[in-house]
């Protein structure tokens, strides 16, 4: 497979799925703006995909858009993370003309300070970069209960060894950066599936 390297001027859209993230979204957007302004030559946009949060997340993002013009809001009914990510990917590619898509959780469990490292790997020729909880330097959130931790470890092990992709340590993590071509391939294969992506 041919590798595609980042070219200056490419558009990078960071997708932030939200549900009741009013307490976190402003801090996250502030951090992302601060961090990405130091990555020269690329146009960053931030797409908040809100699932009708009853806590006012959507209203807060609307006011934030006045402060930063590259913040976009895509609202929809609550249909789960998978559907929100698919809506976000489609909007990022079709409307915002993304060349590169990044996705991260809006609850601050994914460190925005790591995003430049992901971008550097894409720039070096990687097609897909995944942030892993299961490698040195990674961690599982403190607020996860024992059952969730066990389910995550077992689920990832089944996928890693069942599919033979042992070099990827965290298949269920949501911190990713990838080339647009992966969305296009996924979009063709997914059809009407609306589960986790």
Task: State each model region's role.
Residues 23-27, 55-64:
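Acidic helix N-cap motif at the loop->helix transition within catalytic regions
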Residues 50-58, 108:
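A conserved acidic beta->alpha catalytic loop
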Residues 21-37:
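Short, well-formed alpha-helical segments that are part of the catalytic scaffolds
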Residues 81-89, 109, 113, 141-197:
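Conserved catalytic loops of nucleotide-sugar-dependent glycosyltransferases that act on lipid-linked
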Residues 116-143:
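Conserved donor NDP-sugar-binding/catalytic core segment of glycosyltransferases
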Residues 97-109:
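Short beta-strand-to-loop acidic/aromatic patch adjacent to the donor-nucleotide binding site
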């Amino acid at each position: 497979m041919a590798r595609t390297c980042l070219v200056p001027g490419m558009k990078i859209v960071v997708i932030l799925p939200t549900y009741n993230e009013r307490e976190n979204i402003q801090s996250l957007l502030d951090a992302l703006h601060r961090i990405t302004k130091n990555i020269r030559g690329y146009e960053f946009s931030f797409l908040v995909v809100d699932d009708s949060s009853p806590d006012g997340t959507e209203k807060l993002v609307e006011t934030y858009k006045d402060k930063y013009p590259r913040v976009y809001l895509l609202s929809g009914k609550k249909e789960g993370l998978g559907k929100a990510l698919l809506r976000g990917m489609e909007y990022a590619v079709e409307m915002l003309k993304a060349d590169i898509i990044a996705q991260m959780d809006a609850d601050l469990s994914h460190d925005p300070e790591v995003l430049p490292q992901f971008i550097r790997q894409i720039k070096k020729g990687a097609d897909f970069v995944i942030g892993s909880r299961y490698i040195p330097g990674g961690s599982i959130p403190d607020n996860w209960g024992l059952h969730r931790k066990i389910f995550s470890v077992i689920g990832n092990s089944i996928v890693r060894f069942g599919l033979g992709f042992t070099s990827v340590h965290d298949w269920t993590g949501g911190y990713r950066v990838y080339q647009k071509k992966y969305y296009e391939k996924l979009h063709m294969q997914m059809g009407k599936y609306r589960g986790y992506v």
